[in-house]
Each structure stands twice: as C-alpha cells, then as structure tokens.
Amino acid sequence: MSTDILRKIEAYKREEIAAAKARVALDELKARTRDQSAPRGFLKALEAKRAAGQFALIAEIKKASPSKGLIRPDFDPPALAKAYEEGGAACLSVLTDTPSFQGAPEFLTAARQACSLPALRKDFLFDPYQVYEARSWGADCILIIMASVDDDLAKELEDTAFALGMDALIEVHDEAEMERALKLSSRLLGVNNRNLRSFEVNLAVSERLAKMAPSDRLLVGESGIFTHEDCLRLEKSGIGTFLIGESLMRQHDVAAATRALLTGAEKL
C-alpha cells in the first residue's frame, strides 16, 4: 500500500473510530472486554508449533482486498476456521476492515467461536479504543503496522494489548521500521514482503530483514508465500512462522491446501 493509500485508510479509520466512540463509550467497551473468556495465547500457540518442529501458520480469513477485489465468493468464516484448524494452522487472522477488505467484526467472533485457535484482529489501528474493540470481539492478538503509526502510538497500542492479556504482531517492511519495532517489547515481528509503494512482492525482503532480528524474536513471513517450497526457503533465514491468506482462500479444499502448504503433502 502506497503512502497515499495508507493516508486514505487512516482518514476513514479515524472517522470510524469517532463514530464507534459515539455509539459505545470507552467504559462500556472495557466492560465488554471483561465479559470475554481469557485470551488463548497467540504467541504461545505459534511457539508450540515451532517447538514441535513444525511450521507455524497464521491462516487468514479474507473475503477481498483492494488490489485483487473479491477473493472468495463462497465466504463462510466459521467453516474456514474449522478447515484451517483441521489443516494444521496454529492461529487465525481475520480481516475486520470493511471499506477495503469487506471484513467485519462478526467474522472474527464467529470464526474464533468455531474453533480452538487464537485469533488476530487484522486491521489498521490508530487508537487504543480499537484494541479494546478487538478484545470485546474475542481477539487474542492485534496488528501494529509500523508504516502507519509513530513510535509513541505503537507503544500505546502495544501497552493496551498487553494490559488486556493480548499479544501484538508488529509489522515491518524495511530496515528503518525494523529498527523501530525492535524498541517495542513484543517478541512477535511480521516482515511484509510487499513493497508498500510498488506493490511488488519479494521473499528477499524477509531474508534481508531477518538478519536484523535478535534470536529471542519470533519472525513471521507475510505476503508472497504460496507453496511449501516458499516456506522451506524462508526457513533457511530462520523464519518458520507465516501469515498466509489469499493463496489458501482461493482453494476449494482449504484444509487440504493448508496441510499441503505446511507439510509438502500432496493435496488429495
């Protein structure tokens, strides 16, 4: 996403946030978070897969995207969540942004309720209010996109997530953002292989930025990962955790496609 697109997204997000605050006061939202069952442990689920010698997959539930349009016409979040779990995914990522991705909060809640996997709210966050929203919908983890927030806001979002018992996935796409991300406390770092200006995808981005991360961080490869071979390639750079959406969303048998991606087993 270009800087211009990120600016447009921030503009409509800030309108959304203002409207949401007018509908549900922060105190009411905080009360709703207390009604939720405890977070499931997003980072813990990823680490358990890696400790067992397996690739750890954050499997994404995504109906559409700004660049590709409609990705999955037959869109059933609970069924997709079950298929991902059956295929061996460690966690879910669910789009809740409506204008750009045709996502919705209900998709997150329904998907998480249909399985035992922890779930990430995949959205553009600009206000701690959205972290409370995420928890009130059942999310176990939030996404912080370093390209769209300054350091102070990134820390405020992270602190809010941690106070709610959630994890935070910090997304970077270049060296400068990686340096900023390493000042935060979260051990979960996502490297987006998509150039936000040209939209080009190159796995070499993950390979390059992986060298900057200390060994105590869990690196997540994002974008441009389509095959088991792609996973094996990134593993050579110390990345064994992946966030994958579109390539799996386009498959008829999502469980079999997930299994094939993770293990190299042929799809039946």
Curated annotation (Swiss-Prot):
A biological process (GO) annotation for this entry?
Answer: L-tryptophan biosynthetic process
Which reactions appear under catalytic activity for this entry? 1-(2-carboxyphenylamino)-1-deoxy-D-ribulose 5-phosphate + H(+) = (1S,2R)-1-C-(indol-3-yl)glycerol 3-phosphate + CO2 + H2O
Task: Please tell me which top-level EC class this enzyme sits in.
Answer: lyase
Q: In which pathway does it act?
A: Amino-acid biosynthesis; L-tryptophan biosynthesis; L-tryptophan from chorismate: step 4/5
UniProt keyword annotations, A-Z: Amino-acid biosynthesis, Aromatic amino acid biosynthesis, Decarboxylase, Lyase, Tryptophan biosynthesis
**Highest taxon in the source lineage:** Bacteria
What EC designation does it have? 4.1.1.48
NCBIfam families given in the database record: PRK00278.1-2, PRK00278.1-6, PRK00278.2-4
Q: Which HAMAP family match?
A: IGPS_B
* Stated name of the protein: Indole-3-glycerol phosphate synthase
